């Protein structure tokens, strides 16, 4: 299972994101990402370059709440040349914007709302969304399982796996804050998970120390979940 370190707090890219990339570089993290909100385009360009220089895949998650802002962010992701694009709800339009690029697109399943984002929707709806995404040609799905308002988190992860068979990628984003949750989402069928705030604020592993120690703890728990 893959760990995607998000340079974010409360669903926005943090001001010192470039400094955090240097910490991640020391640990040879393979996946590093940011949100489409919280930083200007010029900074996102610098972040994309820095992540690539660190030897990691570049991830971007779209959390903008309006259709127009979402589609602008998808176009920006194409311009930046990220490797993975998560989020957004207008999958057909997103795929058209990304057509011809190598970007792997994982839209939200369920009904995300607000910012920071929460997730409405039952497992049957999430599974149906995933089947539709697979038929469209999406690379996978982004599920805010632990932000759910209408279902048990692991039921949503399992619904994604039923609806999107391998090699489709199921990524659990948001509120992964313990080894137990990493192991649980893996058992439910997830291929990857994201952590931002819990690492940056140093409450993933209380008492372990600042960011580098937090990331080491997450990596160890990720390996243990395999």
Short names for language-model regions:
Residues 41-44, 70, 91-96, 153, ...:
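Short, well-ordered alpha-helical microsegments
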Residues 1-59, 65-68, 74-81, 131-136, ...:
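Conserved N-terminal beta1-alpha1 strand-loop-helix module at the mouth
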Residues 3-8, 30-34, 58-62, 84-87, ...:
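Hydrophobic faces of well-ordered beta-strands that scaffold small-molecule active sites
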Residues 55, 63, 67-149, 163, ...:
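Conserved anion-binding
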Residues 45, 120-128, 151-158, 208-214:
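Charged helix-capping and loop-helix junction motifs
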Residues 67-79, 83, 121-128, 155, ...:
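Catalytic cores of alpha/beta
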Residues 80-93, 136-150, 175-181, 186-211:
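Glycine-rich phosphate-binding active-site loops on the catalytic face of alpha/beta enzymes
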Residues 24, 51, 98, 161-164:
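A generic structural signal for well-ordered alpha-helical segments
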């Amino acid at each position: 299972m893959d760990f995607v370190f998000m340079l974010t707090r409360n669903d926005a890219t943090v001001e010192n994101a470039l400094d955090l990339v240097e910490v991640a570089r020391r640990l040879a993290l393979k996946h590093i990402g940011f949100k489409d909100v919280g930083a200007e385009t010029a900074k996102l360009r610098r972040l994309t370059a820095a992540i690539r220089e660190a030897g990691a895949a570049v991830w971007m998650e779209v959390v903008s709440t309006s259709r127009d802002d979402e589609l602008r962010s998808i176009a920006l992701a194409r311009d930046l040349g990220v490797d993975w694009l998560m989020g957004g709800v207008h999958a057909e339009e997103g795929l058209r914007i990304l057509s011809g690029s190598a970007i792997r697109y994982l839209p939200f399943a369920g009904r995300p709302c607000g910012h920071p984002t929460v997730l409405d929707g039952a497992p049957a709806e999430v599974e149906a969304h995933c089947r539709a995404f697979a038929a469209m040609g999406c690379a996978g799905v982004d599920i805010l399982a632990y932000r759910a308002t209408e279902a048990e988190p692991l039921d949503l992860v399992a619904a994604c796996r039923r609806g999107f068979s391998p090699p489709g990628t199921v990524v659990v984003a948001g509120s992964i804050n313990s080894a137990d949750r990493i192991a649980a989402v893996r058992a439910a069928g997830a291929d990857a998970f994201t952590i931002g705030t819990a690492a940056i604020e140093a409450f993933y592993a209380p008492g372990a120390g600042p960011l580098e120690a937090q990331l080491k703890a997450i990596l160890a728990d990720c390996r243990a979940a395999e």
